[in-house]
Regions:
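C-terminal segment of N-terminal export signals and the immediately downstream linker at the start
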Residues: 1, 22-59
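N-terminal glycine-rich anion-binding loop in soluble enzyme alpha/beta folds
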Residues: 43-48, 67-79
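N-terminal small/glycine-rich loop or linker at the start of catalytic domains
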Residues: 57-73, 130-139, 182-195
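Short, well-ordered coil/turn segments that N-cap beta-strands
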Residues: 65-67, 93-95, 124-126, 160-162, ...
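Active-site beta->alpha loop and helix N-cap motifs at the rims of alpha/beta catalytic domains
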Residues: 72-89, 96-99, 103-177
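A generic secondary-structure signal
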Residues: 87-91, 118, 154, 181, ...
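Catalytic alpha/beta core domains of metabolic enzymes, predominantly
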Residues: 168-178, 184-309
């Protein structure tokens, strides 16, 4: 795992030399990991398909059935944030709620920890995910790695959450401390990576997801920006390969933008176990589908895949 700012500065070099099979033998992923080569047709004899893992948070089983639907609170004041938490808790089509403190003014870790305890009570039986998204990854506020680590530490120690999102390309020592504390507190840790300008190669997508697993991520998350349907299909294919060849961990992958809409509703086909949806016409990322619509589409696809009595 390395710093995102270093990745951006050397993007041309990374794109030229690290995307295909040699990336799996790089210093980031040791050859001892014994990763299987990507075979788009079938597994070779002796290969075992990863055992799919299910994570249960409250009454929500992630990794089982149709992808679970998450909605984000994009509120800009504590009062409107709490109002949204209560409203989302009463929406049966939503399976989980994402708290987004990066949009709520200039709250400190202590201030949000206090606020999160009240918000958590309002969420009822819905799992609560906490995400502080930096502006460099599409969020509302830019903070240093040290500040980020202190914020998460405060919320994990004194706030109320079930599950946290950790930006993959933060300082690795900060990320590891957050993961260590989250697991000690019995919380679900989810590394994430967001590419708001482009879609990496299929093998680079796979590599980044496996980097997350290696660092202890319970759920693997990656979002890319699709500029055409081919970008979306590449993300979907990479997700399928991770699920069928490399990892049984639950995943949350998506291609953003209008060309990536299909990826948000077809996770049961590809291996993505969660999806973000829009409430009230305000998306937290480009290309989100209204929550009732995406739930309906996924249910239709599920029933067609597994017809009753078949």
């Amino acid at each position: 795992m390395f710093d995102r700012r270093s990745l951006i500065k050397s993007a041309a070099g990374s794109m030229a030399g690290a995307f295909l099979a040699p990336a799996f033998a790089s210093s980031v992923l040791s050859p001892d990991d014994k990763l299987m080569p990507v075979d788009t047709r079938n597994g070779r004899s002796g290969w075992a398909k990863p055992v799919k893992q299910v994570i249960q948070i409250k009454n929500c089983r992630i990794g089982e059935g149709t992808p679970k639907v998450i909605a984000s609170t994009m509120a800009k004041t504590p009062e409107s944030f709490l109002k949204l938490m209560k409203e989302y808790a009463e929406m049966p089509e939503l399976d989980a709620i994402e708290m987004r403190p990066d949009y709520i003014g200039e709250l400190s870790g202590k201030e949000f920890a206090d606020l999160s305890r009240e918000a958590y009570k309002l969420a009822g039986n819905k799992p609560v995910l906490m995400t502080f998204r930096d502006k460099t990854e599409g969020g509302g506020r830019h903070v240093t790695d040290d500040w980020y680590g202190q914020f998460y530490t405060e919320v994990l120690n004194n706030g109320a959450v079930d599950w946290i999102d950790i930006e993959q390309f933060r300082d690795i020592s900060v990320c590891r401390e957050i993961v260590k504390l989250a697991k000690a507190k019995g919380k679900v840790a989810m590394f994430s990576d967001h590419e708001f300008k482009w879609t990496p190669s299929e093998d680079e997508i796979i590599r980044r997801l496996l980097m997350q697993e290696k660092e202890g991520s319970d759920i693997l998350k990656l979002a890319v920006m699709a500029h055409n349907t081919g970008d979306a299909l590449r993300l979907m294919s990479a997700t399928w390969k991770v699920r069928n060849y490399y990892s049984g961990k639950p995943m949350l992958t998506m291609a953003m933008g209008r060309w990536g809409v299909l990826s948000r509703a077809t996770g049961e086909f590809t291996g993505s176990d969660l999806t973000f949806a829009m409430v009230g016409g305000i998306p937290s990322a480009p290309g989100q589908i209204p929550y009732k619509d995406v739930k309906k589409v996924m249910d239709i696809l599920h029933d067609a895949m597994y017809p009753k009595g078949a």
